[in-house]
UniProtKB/Swiss-Prot annotation:
GO terms for cellular component: ribonucleoprotein complex; ribosome. One of its GO terms (molecular function) is structural constituent of ribosome. SUPFAM superfamilies: Ribosomal protein S8. NCBIfam families: PRK00136.1. InterPro entries: Ribosomal_uS8, Ribosomal_uS8_CS, Ribosomal_uS8_sf. Belongs to the universal ribosomal protein uS8 family. This is Small ribosomal subunit protein uS8. It comes from the Bacteria. One of the primary rRNA binding proteins, it binds directly to 16S rRNA central domain where it helps coordinate assembly of the platform of the 30S subunit. PROSITE patterns: RIBOSOMAL_S8. Part of the 30S ribosomal subunit. Contacts proteins S5 and S12.
Amino acid sequence: MSMSDPIADMLTRIRNAQQVEKMAVSMPSSKVKVAIAKVLKDEGYIEDFAVRGEAGKPELELQLKYYAGRPVIEHIERVSKPGLRIYKGAGDLPRVKNGLGVAIVSTSSGVMTDRHARAKGVGGEVLCFVA
């Protein structure tokens, strides 16, 4: 069965795993999912990630992070969807929780946070909000 929105599936798996306090969650891997996982790790929202499995069906495994018994990711939300893509210029990129959260943006320079995109002066598709 084909999946219409693999990024939304990734975010839902993370949200569900953290609600039941799992230490790790796995999902089918793709280049965009690995790039999102790298941003989440760089920003301190997950412990680590790894791509495992055979060449035909790689699996992305995320090690989730908790602080004082609570998930570090309080809120994770898909913004741009297959039926309604959301593109923003460098000056129009949204700030999440007044800068306490991040917007993950897919730009021509790769997947990065809203802060990095603003610093580079590039806009792109707003994939999700994380706080």
